Amino acid sequence: MAPISRETDFLVIGGGSGGIATARAAAGKYGIKSMVVEGKRLGGTCVNVGCVPKKVTFYAALVAETIHQAKDYGFSVEQTAPFDWPTFKQKRDAYVARLNGIYERNLANDKVEYVHGWAKLLSPNSVEVTLDDGTKSVVNAKKILIAVGGNPTIPPHIPGSEYGTNSDGFFDIDTLPKKVALVGAGYIAVEFAGMLNALGVETHLFIRHDTFLRSFDPMIQQVSVKEYERIGVKVHKKSQLTSVQKDAAGKLAINFKEGEGEQSISDVDHLIWAVGRTPAVEGLGLDKAGVKTNEKGYIEVDEYQNTSTENIYAVGDVCGQVELTPVAIAAGRKLAARLFGPEEFRTLKLNYDNVPSVVFAHPEIGSIGLTEPEAVAKYGAENLKIYKSSFTAMYYAMMKPEDKAPTAYKLICAGPEEKVVGLHIIGLGSGEILQGFGVAVNMGATKADFDNCVAIHPTSAEELVTLK
């Protein structure tokens, strides 16, 4: 490996989506001498243990569902048994490895210096980099970006919790399990539960309340929980794990409270914790540079991604704002433009309102803007008009009633002009549907604008422009 530079204009700590996007914009677009330091694989959580391998697994689950449904369309298709998880995992891992290589080549193409190692702040303008061979180098930088992301957590207070794995460990599972327990009520737990269930795994999902995805609109919560129970996910409501035991064969016994009673399930192959993430700031030397964090350990930033220390910035999950890959990328690119671009970009910043988000559940969920309770709190119920529709997508027309998944849409409109301030959808294709409607909501579209768009028939999405 060539010696690393001792001086740079822009040093990025963290080679995930946000860090790489910012460094590439700085170097490739504005000609700034830039360096990225990353101790793991390039691409961060999203590429390696998040969005990308998760979506590939989601597609595998969709194929399994399609095979099951094929007979309703006249195909005599046998379920391929057993599902070849090892081959699937090998191909998924190879795809991720290709992306790692693409990220590295993209950095090289934009003339960003990439250093595989661990960075630690020594001062507001200097960083100690520990390379793979243990040697250390000090790099002085005019500006520093912290984009180190976060790590999934495992609760330490539950006896035997260490026998479980976190969401990262899910992608290391070598064989398709027969029985899995997941703990959590957010994106990750819900997505994993849906995928595993579709692949034929007995799936237990432990949640603390009556619904999951509790930051989403109540309609989404209610419809999705009911559907998960219908398709066979064992949702343990108002539950709390009390202990975990592991037998000589490696099987787990999960002890838990559900409602008022004590219960347990045995012969569990994997326990997956999906109970939140913490910022990856340990050992980063934030105190040496005077970078402040909040009570949860997230780096404090203002609306321009400035930290408490001049010339040190932060983007992505380490800030604890909207923890989504495209948000980190967008914030990073705007930061690069503000710092290194022309004068008219000096006040550029990311607007964190109306960020679209999708849960690759079964069925998919899409959401942008305010939930109904949030809209009531902001505008008052008397100033809102709520449009709702529930129906069965045409895809299910050939199937028996008990095999039909739901579709439910909601538009939340505010004021006399009926500006669309919230849009929430659950049903087939919601992830793809939401992107275009997200543009409309961000442009300030009204209900009349939606109505004036000619429907595309027959589609599920046409319902959003024909709501009454």
Swiss-Prot record:
Chain residues that bind NADP(+) = 185, 188, 191, 208, 214, 276, 323, 358
Q: Report which reactions are catalysed by this protein.
A: 2 glutathione + NADP(+) = glutathione disulfide + NADPH + H(+)
Is DNA-binding set as a keyword in this record? Answer: no
**Locations listed in the record:** Cytoplasm; Mitochondrion
Which PROSITE patterns does the annotation name? Answer: PYRIDINE_REDOX_1
| One of the Pfam families matching this protein, by short name | Pyr_redox_dim
**Gene Ontology biological-process annotations:** cell redox homeostasis; cellular response to menadione; cellular response to oxidative stress; glutathione metabolic process
Q: A cellular component term (GO) from this record?
A: mitochondrion
Disulfide bond sites: 46-51
User: Catalytic positions?
Assistant: 457
Q: Which cofactors, if any, are listed as required?
A: FAD
Matching entries from NCBIfam families are given as: gluta_reduc_1 (TIGR01421), PRK06116.1 (NF004776)
Which protein family is named in the record? Belongs to the class-I pyridine nucleotide-disulfide oxidoreductase family.
**Subunit details:** Homodimer.
Miscellaneous notes for this chain? The active site is a redox-active disulfide bond.
| Stated name of the protein | Glutathione reductase
